[in-house]
């Protein structure tokens, strides 16, 4: 299923621009609203969607995404329900790539073979599992690749030249460069250093390199888009959703539009920038 991911990047390259990759938490604030948000993302300009798996101990996530996960869990969202949402999304959209992003525990509990079968059937294109290092590829990465699912790795500012080959081994779809140290949504990246890091990674792989963590505005997205193959935005979208909620974490009449409006701004930022070398 990496074909959808490859096709998305090919379309962006043909337009001379970076891809916009948007992250939202599955089931936030409730499953039905979450599906409407998921459906709104491509229409507002997202090229690829990352769909977060709610988990009780999200060690790499900042306050915004932690809160989103708690809202989703409170609403009864689990891995089975997340796959069901993607199946429903696929009824109306067979083009936009969907990448599940989360932690290994829910997948392990579900059962890896059953998860991979169900993910493939639901129309999942790839996985980002932040707490499975390359040394544990046999747990999920290699079985996922056998099923045609992209296993996408994170590289960070602390990933040195000795470590990078291990990070890139068995990676498919794209490489996700984390632009800051720390948790999501807590700082603004140094755009100059990010560009240098992207160049260093790109010299070692033919895969697209996308950049996330700390990207919150259309202007941020435009800066990253100059040198990266894709721009990932998550915490800012989750924040926009949270601000739209009614008391009791209930969806408001403007919840879906609050997210879509920011995606349109981010999309304009990405599309306003001609990618370096394009």
Curated annotation (Swiss-Prot):
Listed SUPFAM superfamilies: Ribulose-phoshate binding barrel
Catalytic activity: (1S,2R)-1-C-(indol-3-yl)glycerol 3-phosphate + L-serine = D-glyceraldehyde 3-phosphate + L-tryptophan + H2O
Keyword Amino-acid biosynthesis assigned: yes
The protein's enzyme class: lyase
Pathway entry: Amino-acid biosynthesis; L-tryptophan biosynthesis; L-tryptophan from chorismate: step 5/5
Quaternary structure (record): Tetramer of two alpha and two beta chains.
Role description: The alpha subunit is responsible for the aldol cleavage of indoleglycerol phosphate to indole and glyceraldehyde 3-phosphate.
Protein name in UniProt: Tryptophan synthase alpha chain
